[in-house]
Amino acid sequence: MQDQYILALDQGTTSSRAMLFDRQGNIVSIAQKEFEQIYPRPGWVEHDPQEIWSTQAGVAAEAVTRVGLNGTSIAAIGITNQRETTIVWDRETGHPIYNAIVWQDRRTADFCDQLKAQGLSEKVRAKTGLPIDSYFSATKIRWILDNVEGAREKARQGKLAFGTVDSWLVWNFTKHELHVTDVTNASRTMLFNIHTLDWDDELLDALEIPRSMLPQVRASSEIYGPTKTTVFASKIPLAGIAGDQQAALFGQMCTSSGMVKNTYGTGCFLMMNTGETPIESQNNLVTTIAWQVDGKVNYALEGSIFIAGAVVQWLRDGLGIIKSASEIEALAAGVPHTDGVYLVPAFAGLGAPHWNARARGSLFGVTRGTTSAHLARAALDSIAYQSLDVLKAMEADSGIRIGELRVDGGASANNLLMQFQADLLGVDAVRPRVTETTALGAAYLAGLAIGYWKNVDELHSQWQLERRFAPSMQREQVSSCLCGWQRAVRAAKAWADDTQ
């Protein structure tokens, strides 16, 4: 396998990407193609499943051919994907019966309220680790069965298949032979029992979803089967699958209990490895599966922040303070601090650990002396404050003091933000040399399954530091900053609650 590579397919919310990795974990080639976002009604978000497949197959071929290689140069394929997004297709024709309903879609919010009113919340959380929410796949499947003509009858006859995006890609790569998913994607459906590691019949009955629709659940690192499409002339083992955030946790080599990563994108996704025992959160975090490798399941706590990098986009597009997102660091660095200004970017409510849907964006402490630089700094600081709130909830739930924070995603390139994050947390923020950790994680999982890499220890030896940000702020100053932030969050919530 000396001259072979691992192909990672990263099927995201706005684009399909493919990356080739060599044995040292370096990116050899990369290809990307965006696809259409479909908004049929306010709060509804859909994708065309055929476009998901065509763009992903296209970039897979492009990444390989652009460096003069072919399928024989690929040792294995790993898949990572946007989670929860729901596709239902006809087993006989292989065609979707409706568009993919995306994780952001809120059309089933009222139905979720009905499930809560039936007293199902505790049962769902105990079995799946998840709150009842339209974010997850279960109610999206139910909506398709209830609203697509003939769907319920076809499902009863066993003619329909459900899958998250990974399942849909594998189904197509194997010419409709394999209907599988992995434990990480299954754990995001609200139908999978994370303790028994099987679909939960009681929840399937409650949601009136036939078990025959569901894929077989497999480990995150194993050979599922060979490709059979014309995308590649040779058959390549499909050998790794993980949801995007779990893949990033693995790509960051957070393989020990208590290790944490934060992906700074449009929002933030924080995940802590909690080892081989699931921890039920008392602080509004999600309990989920991190991965299953070598027969062992690792669990994780996860917290999502709705607005992170998006606050920078707002400064650019909404206020016109900056012309491009990259300008914010220099502007914010023009002042030593915010001078008491706090921005709570609750443009779409507050995510973990607050989960307040009514809260709205709020700005506090503004004076005549407040400048665009202060606003820019307050915007960056808000990302670090929100992340700290989730990290403190993780520490409280797990009883583990975080030793360091591994960071990735677009906004992790902002040195000012990373330094402030380290200052608030009181431990180092650590940025790796390869920040494409999601694709890297998928590559690692596939490579382990075929022996391309011997074991996790070999992968640990590859992880390389790009920069370490050590805390430098006095703790008294940190405490003062945090008091101001907590006041601002309380006020933002109070404003939302006081509608009189």
From Swiss-Prot:
It comes from Burkholderia thailandensis (strain ATCC 700388 / DSM 13276 / CCUG 48851 / CIP 106301 / E264). It holds the Pfam family FGGY_N. One of its GO terms (cellular component) is cytosol. This is Glycerol kinase. The keyword Chloroplast does not apply. CDD domains: FGGY_EcGK_like. ADP binds at residues 13, 17, 266, 309, 410, 414. HAMAP family: Glycerol_kin. The gene is glpK. ATP binds at residues 13-15, 266, 309, 313, 410. Belongs to the FGGY kinase family.
